[in-house]
Amino acid sequence: MRVPEKYSTLPAEDRSVHIVNICAIEDLGYLPSEGTLLNSLSVDPDAECKYGLYFRDGKRKVDYILVYHHKRASGSRTLARRGLQNDMVLGTRSVRQDQPLPGKGSPVDAGSPEVPMDYHEDDKRFRREEYEGNLLEAGLELENDEDTKIHGVGFVKIHAPWHVLCREAEFLKLKMPTKKVYHISETRGLLKTINSVLQKITDPIQPKVAEHRPQTTKRLSYPFSREKQHLFDLTDRDSFFDSKTRSTIVYEILKRTTCTKAKYSMGITSLLANGVYSAAYPLHDGDYEGDNVEFNDRKLLYEEWASYGVFYKYQPIDLVRKYFGEKVGLYFAWLGAYTQMLIPASIVGVIVFLYGCATVDENIPSMEMCDQRYNITMCPLCDKTCSYWKMSSACATARASHLFDNPATVFFSVFMALWAATFMEHWKRKQMRLNYRWDLTGFEEEEEAVKDHPRAEYEARVLEKSLRKESRNKETDKVKLTWRDRFPAYFTNLVSIIFMIAVTFAIVLGVIIYRISTAAALAMNSSPSVRSNIRVTVTATAVIINLVVIILLDEVYGCIARWLTKIEVPKTEKSFEERLTFKAFLLKFVNSYTPIFYVAFFKGRFVGRPGDYVYIFRSFRMEECAPGGCLMELCIQLSIIMLGKQLIQNNLFEIGIPKMKKFIRYLKLRRQSPSDREEYVKRKQRYEVDFNLEPFAGLTPEYMEMIIQFGFVTLFVASFPLAPLFALLNNIIEIRLDAKKFVTELRRPVAIRAKDIGIWYNILRGVGKLAVIINAFVISFTSDFIPRLVYLYMYSQNGTMHGFVNHTLSSFNVSDFQNGTAPNDPLDLGYEVQICRYKDYREPPWSEHKYDISKDFWAVLAARLAFVIVFQNLVMFMSDFVDWVIPDIPKDISQQIHKEKVLMVELFMREEQGKQQLLDTWMEKEKPRDVPCNNHSPTTHPEAGDGSPVPSYEYHGDAL
C-alpha cells in the first residue's frame, strides 16, 4: 500500500498522532462512509477544547483508553526520537520506509543519535503493535499519543464506529429502547392519593435529577438486531449508545482480541497482567467542579449525590446506573435500602435502651448488689496479689448491665430476627423493580454464553497443559483443567485457611493472657483508684488491642484470600469473584468476631472454683465474669470494635488515604524544576487526568464492610441494642463517602450488567439465620434472663426478685485455698475473712458433697437449653412466615412485565402481517396479464365504499 501524498505532508507538531497498522487500512475494508482511520489526520482547530474526550478531529468520541510505559532518551521528546521509534515499528510491518505514514515522524537523519532499546521493552512494544493491529481488524479505530505531560507514558485512544457498536450490541444481546412507547399502569383510588401525598412530602429530599422523576411512560426494549434496526429510535445515532454502553462494547472486544505471540494470547487481561499495558479504562464524562465546566452526568452526580451537603436526599440510583452500570447501581441501591431499613431498627433499639435507663432504679438485683448492708465479701480475682473485695464495689457495673440486660432485649432480639427477614424480602422486591426499570428481565438467559467466557489465567493454564500434551504426542482436543490439576491449589487453600484461623485464635489467646497478667499487675498497685478500676482498664485496653489486630489482619487476609483464589485458577470471572468473596468473608468473619465469641460464650465458663482453679500454661488463671455477668463486657467489646472499625477502617482510611496521596503528589511537584512544574499545572487531557486516579478494584471491599456491619447489627443485638443506630449514622456518611470516591477519586469502572448482588445475598441470608441461633444463646447463657426466670418461678419466697443475688452466689471456706494461692494480705478489708462468695451454683463447704455442682445448676441449664430450642424454632418459623407472606415480585411489576411481553408479541405480529401484505401486493403486481381473472382470484367483498370488490388475504403463519 502507498499512502497518498496529501497525508504525508503534515506539520511536525501533528506527527505525534500515529495510527498503528495503518498499512492494512485498505485490506480491512474501511470505507469513507463508515469513518476511515485517515479522518483522524484532519485536525479540528476546536478539538483541543474537548480536552481528550475526542480524537484529534474533534468528532469521534474516545470510548476507551489503553496506557503503556515507554522509555525516552534522558526524558527528551525530540522528533528524532519519535522518528526512530516509528521506523522501528515500520520495520516489522513490511511497509516501505522511504515514505512516512500518516502522523509519523520523518525518517531519522544520519546524524541522529542511535538509542539503544531494551529487549524486554522492545518485546512489549511488538506485542502492543500486534494487539492493536488485531483491534483494527476487529473494526475499532485507534489514535496514539506519546507526546503527553506524563513522562514515559503513552496513550492509545479507542473509538468504536457505528457498525462495530451495532455488531457487538447484537452479539451481547443488549436490550435497547424501541420506538414503541407505552403508558405505565398507575395506582388508583386510595393508594394513588397516598402516593401523591408522599411525593409532595418527600419532594424536598428528592435529587434534582431527570432520571429520578416518576415516569408515566416507558419505551419498550428489545435485544438489538441489525436486521430490525427499523424498530429502534435511531434519529440520533450519537446518543443511541451512551458512553457506558460504548465502553462496555469496547471492553468486550478488548477481552476477546488475542495476541498470538508467545504466551500473550488472552486479550487485554493477560496483557495488563504481564505489563504490556499498564492500565485500561473508559473516560469520565468531564470535570465535576469548576466555574467553566461543561455540564455532564459526572458533574450532576457530584452535585446531587457525591456531596456531603445532600446527605439527607435520596440517591439518584437511575443516574448512577446510567453512568457506572448496573452492578455499581445495584450496590448503591442495596446500600440505600439497607440504610433505610435501619431507621425502624434504630428507633426500636433506642426505645429498648431508654427502657433500661428508666427501670435501672427499679431493678432489684442491682439494688441488692449496691446495698452495702448486705456486706457480701467476694473471693479474690487472682492468686496471691489480689485481696478479698466487697460486692458493693461493683455497683456501677451492675447498674450499667441492666441497661442492656433486661426483658426488653429479648423482645428486641425477636424483632431484629423478623427485621432481617423483612429486609431481605424488601430488597428482593426492590431488586425486581430495578430489573424492570433497567430492562434486565430475562437477562440471565441472554447472558449465559457471554458470562462463561474463560479468564485469561485459565486459558493460559489450559494452553500450557495442551502444549505439554503435544510434546508427549497425546490428544489435545477439549483440554480443560481437572481436579487433579487443581488439587495442589485446593490443598494449599485448605492448609492456609486453617493456619490463618489458628493465627486468629492464637492472637485471641495472647490477648487473654495480657488481660490476666495486666489485672494481676494492677492489683498490686498501691493506688486505691487504680485497683477499683481494674476491670474497666483491662477491658478497654484489651479491646483496643483487639481492634488494632483486627484492622491489620483484615488487610492481610484480604491479600491472602485473593492469592489463594488466583492459584485455584477459576474458569470464569463470576466463579473467581464468588470464591474470592467466600474466602475473604470466612477469614474476616473469624477475625472480626472471634474476640466477641470468646467474651460471649467462653469467658467465665471454664474458671473452676476457689481452691481448684483452671490455669493456662500452669501460670495464668482463667478470667471470671463480673458479678453482673459478662453481658456488659460484651457490650463494651462490641461497641468499641464496631465503632472503631467503622470509624478507622471504613471512613478514616477512605478519607485520609486519598488526601495523603494528594499531599505526596504535591511534595513531588515542589521538588521538580520550575519548567516541569509549569508544564504540570497546565490543563491535562481527560485521559491524563484519569490516569492519575486510583484504579477501580471491584465492589468486594465495599460489600464486605457492610456485611460485617450487618453481622454486628444482627448477631449480638441482644447485648447491644444501640448497634442499629450507630450503623445508621455510619451508613449515612458511608453512602456519600463511597459516592465521592467513585465520582472523584476512582477511574471510571467498566459498566457490567447484573440483575442481583450475587453471592452476597446468600451470605446475608446465612448471617440472618445464624443471628437467630447466636442471639438465643446470648440471651440464654450470657445474660441472667433465664436464671432470673428460674428463681422467680421456682425459688422466690414472695414472687419477687429479692434474694436473687444471694441465690446465684456460692460459699467458699478460705482454709481450703491451695498452697500459694491465698491472698498475701488477708486483712485488706480490715477484718479476717473466713467465708468468701463466688458466682456459681455449687454446694457449700458444710455440705456432705462440698463444692460439687448443685441441683440448681442443672435446673437453670435445662431452662436455658429449653429456651434456646423454643426461641430458635419460634423465630425461624416467624421469619419463614414473613418470607412466605411477602411476594418476591410486586404485583404491579408483574403486571407491567406481562404487559411488555404482550406488546412485544403485538409489535412483531403487526410487522409480520405488514410484510405478508407487501409480499402479496408484490405478487399480485407480478401476475401475467393474460391469466384469466377467475383463476387464483382473492375472495371479494362487495361492501367496499366505491362498490368495487375488496381483496381479503388470510394469514395462517406463525408471527413469531
UniProtKB/Swiss-Prot annotation:
Modified residues (Phosphoserine): 196
GO biological process: cellular response to heat; chloride transmembrane transport; chloride transport; detection of temperature stimulus involved in sensory perception of pain; establishment of localization in cell; glial cell projection elongation; mucus secretion; phospholipase C-activating G protein-coupled receptor signaling pathway
UniProt-reported outcome of changing residue 588 to A/Q: Decreased permeability to chloride ions
Impact when changing residue 551 to K: Induces phospholipid scramblase activity
Extracellular side: 355-406, 515-542, 603-631, 780-866
Effect of residue 555 to K: Induces phospholipid scramblase activity
Cytoplasmic topology ranges: 1-333, 428-493, 564-581, 653-699, 742-758, 888-960
Pfam family, one: Anoctamin
Top-level taxon in the UniProt lineage: Eukaryota
Binding site for Ca(2+) 1: 651, 705, 734
Result of altering residue 883 to A/K: Increased Ca(2+) sensitivity
Protein's cellular compartments: Apical cell membrane; Presynapse
Further facts: The term 'anoctamin' was coined because these channels are anion selective and are predicted to have eight (OCT) transmembrane segments. There is some dissatisfaction in the field with the Ano nomenclature because it is not certain that all the members of this family are anion channels or have the 8-transmembrane topology.
Role this protein plays: Calcium-activated chloride channel (CaCC). Plays a role in transepithelial anion transport and smooth muscle contraction. Required for the normal functioning of the interstitial cells of Cajal (ICCs) which generate electrical pacemaker activity in gastrointestinal smooth muscles. Acts as a major contributor to basal and stimulated chloride conductance in airway epithelial cells and plays an important role in tracheal cartilage development. Required for CFTR activation by enhancing endoplasmic reticulum Ca(2+) store release and is also required for CFTR membrane expression.
Subunit and interaction comment: Homodimer. Interacts with CFTR. Interacts with TRPV4.
Protein name: Anoctamin-1
Species this chain originates from: Mus musculus (Mouse)
Gene assigned in the entry: Ano1
